[in-house]
Amino acid sequence: HVALALAYVILANHDHVKLHLLQENGGASPFYRRRRRMTDCFNFLAAATPNGALDLAASLSGHLQRLRRPGKAILISDFLMPAAAYQQGLNLLRAFNLDIAAIQVLSRQEVEPQFPNGSLALVDSESAKEIKYQWNDKARREYQTRLAHHNLELKSFCHQSGIHYSLYVNDRDLGDFVFATLPAIGLFK
């Protein structure tokens, strides 16, 4: 939804947009111009199916090789990867002299897990690896502390690197995020 909302704003402002899927064999759309191409944006994104772990830098590199001129890059991700992985990817974008925005999208469940106390079997959505975990109040606090540290580290890296950054938790009003938060961080005027 975030990608579609941003595409709409860009197209409504008489600019053009190109969508890239960052995954193994991830494709790219053609450049879309004008609001009437929103259906094409929707169809392109609707056809995408997540598949496996992401090597951010390698995936970006493939798309950047075809870049003809500098512009704006908006990277939408959960950024739930090691700091070195997202830093390498974002630095690659910086090397291409792009105006970069990093939009971290998390679900409310990722921010505030509501698991019942007890034994859990968690399945990684990217690797399909299952781990057994004992969940309780202490584990919840530790998880939230680690996530907050990870997010702060990402935000700090972006700030120090001149990258626009914002966190969007998906139970928040998307219109408010796109039309109030993103202009406030300098993404749109």
Where on the chain are the PLM-derived regions?
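Exposed, interaction-prone extracellular/peripheral surfaces
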Residues: 1-189
